[in-house]
């Protein structure tokens, strides 16, 4: 192409002559003026910006995420703060990469390890965050996973669950969140090694390492084991946030030993619950390694948040206060039948006590309420005269029948 000075030549795009513009560029039987070039450049720049903006995720601030978690999750203030900051930084990192600003700086992703007893809210925290961010979310159980060559589930099947949660939209899946539960159950052990199933744990940790740190994985769309000539879906895990959780029963003893506070003999059972929780807050990478996770695996989980054991008061709040509180749900279910449901304070305390006795935490609350409500929910729809049901402590303990108020009783 060259600049031409022939005044009779017109721009092939806007029709302006050489005299009307500053420059006219000639090609093979085609001409373009400087104004059309400038306009084309602006259009291209705007389209490029739109593409970059489409790759950018709208991320809530840590405070906004924390406030959202508070609407659904009772207690666990430290864990909620740690999660909010870690998730914010993770998606900010993705946006930073998409914007191609300061390409010489590589931001590494920060996967998260949640440590806390059963029923303390580990899974629910991750699930609630993913929902608030509108990103695909999948849950996997570490105990079902094995390394290649053993009987069990390939680690790539975790990614299949995320793909399914995103309706096989690969781009969305590659920005999703995966929660792997019971990660403490794959802590390496030296005994009971099987030739058909990897129960030592280390092999599974090694297999998980690659997808957690970031790799392009081949996922069988139908699940199961990989087979030769099988069609695979390629998914890049570098922007998938992995949150792993476990109870890590006994790790507080490892912390006590490190801190030089090991209690020997009869007095070992005299430690208060709050003391156990305080030891959990002191966990460092060294303790997790002694428990059985390999250093390379721990290194891919730089954010560690410890959840506290839920108290009776916490469980009562969980029953009644969050937006999706169980008591609110059951009240609404009976309200559909025009029946008011009331739980006395003693009933709520009894439900919380049962959950603590069963060591199920918040996870076990629904099953306890179901036991109490099953006969009520069976009978009430058949009795239009019932207007109110009252649940007392004795009802929860199985020592009395619920009080049913009928229309005739009010007259």
From Swiss-Prot:
Chain sites annotated for binding Zn(2+): 11, 14, 33, 36
Top-level taxon of the source organism: Bacteria
Transcription as UniProt keyword: no
BP GO terms, sorted: cell division; proteolysis involved in protein catabolic process
GO cellular component: a single term: HslUV protease complex
GO molecular function, a single term: ATP hydrolysis activity
Binding-site residues, ATP: 117-124
PROSITE patterns assigned to the protein according to its UniProt record, in alphabetical order: CLPX_ZB (PS51902)
Pfam families: AAA_2, ClpB_D2-small, zf-C4_ClpX
Record keywords: ATP-binding, Chaperone, Metal-binding, Nucleotide-binding, Zinc
The ClpX-type ZB domain, residue ranges: 1-52
Quaternary structure, from the entry: Component of the ClpX-ClpP complex. Forms a hexameric ring that, in the presence of ATP, binds to fourteen ClpP subunits assembled into a disk-like structure with a central cavity, resembling the structure of eukaryotic proteasomes.
Similarity-based family: Belongs to the ClpX chaperone family.
Role noted for this protein: ATP-dependent specificity component of the Clp protease. It directs the protease to specific substrates. Can perform chaperone functions in the absence of ClpP.
Protein name: ATP-dependent Clp protease ATP-binding subunit ClpX
Lineage per the UniProt record: Bacteria, Bacillati, Bacillota, Bacilli, Lactobacillales
């Amino acid at each position: 192409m060259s600049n031409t000075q022939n005044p009779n030549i017109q721009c092939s795009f806007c029709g302006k002559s050489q005299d009307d513009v500053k420059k006219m560029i000639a090609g093979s039987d085609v001409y373009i003026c400087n104004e059309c070039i400038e306009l084309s450049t602006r259009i291209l720049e705007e389209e490029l910006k739109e593409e970059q903006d489409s790759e950018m995720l709208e991320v809530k601030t840590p405070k906004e995420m924390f406030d959202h978690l508070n609407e659904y999750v009772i207690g666990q203030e430290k864990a909620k703060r740690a999660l909010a900051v870690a998730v914010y930084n993770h998606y900010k990192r993705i946006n930073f990469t998409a914007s191609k600003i300061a390409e010489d700086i590589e931001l590494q992703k920060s996967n998260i390890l949640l440590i806390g007893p059963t029923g303390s809210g580990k899974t629910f925290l991750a699930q609630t965050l993913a929902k608030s961010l509108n990103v695909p979310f999948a849950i996997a159980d570490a105990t079902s996973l094995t390394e290649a060559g053993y009987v069990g589930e390939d680690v790539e099947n975790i990614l299949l669950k995320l793909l399914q949660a995103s309706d096989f939209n690969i781009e969305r899946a590659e920005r999703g969140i995966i929660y792997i539960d019971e990660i403490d159950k794959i802590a390496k052990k030296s005994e009971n090694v099987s030739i058909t199933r990897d129960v030592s744990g280390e092999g599974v940790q090694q297999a998980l390492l690659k997808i957690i740190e970031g790799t392009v994985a081949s996922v069988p769309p139908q699940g199961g084991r990989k087979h030769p000539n099988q069609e695979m879906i390629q998914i890049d895990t570098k922007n998938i946030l992995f949150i792993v959780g476990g109870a890590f029963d006994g790790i507080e003893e490892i912390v006590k030993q490190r801190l030089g506070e090991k209690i020997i003999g009869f007095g070992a059972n005299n430690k208060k619950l709050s003391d156990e929780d305080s030891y959990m807050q002191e966990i460092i990478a060294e303790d997790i390694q002694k428990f059985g996770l390999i250093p390379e695996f721990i290194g891919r989980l730089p954010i560690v948040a410890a959840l506290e054991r839920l108290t009776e008061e916490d469980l009562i709040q969980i029953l009644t206060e969050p937006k999706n509180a169980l008591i609110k749900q059951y009240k609404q279910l009976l309200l559909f039948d025009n029946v008011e449901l009331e739980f006395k304070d003693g009933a709520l305390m009894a439900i919380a006590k049962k959950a603590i006795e069963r060591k199920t935490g918040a996870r076990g609350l629904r099953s306890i309420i179901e036991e109490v409500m099953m006969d009520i929910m069976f009978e009430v729809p058949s009795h239009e005269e019932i207007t109110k049901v009252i649940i007392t402590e004795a009802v929860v303990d199985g020592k009395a029948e619920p009080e049913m108020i009928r229309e005739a009783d009010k007259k």
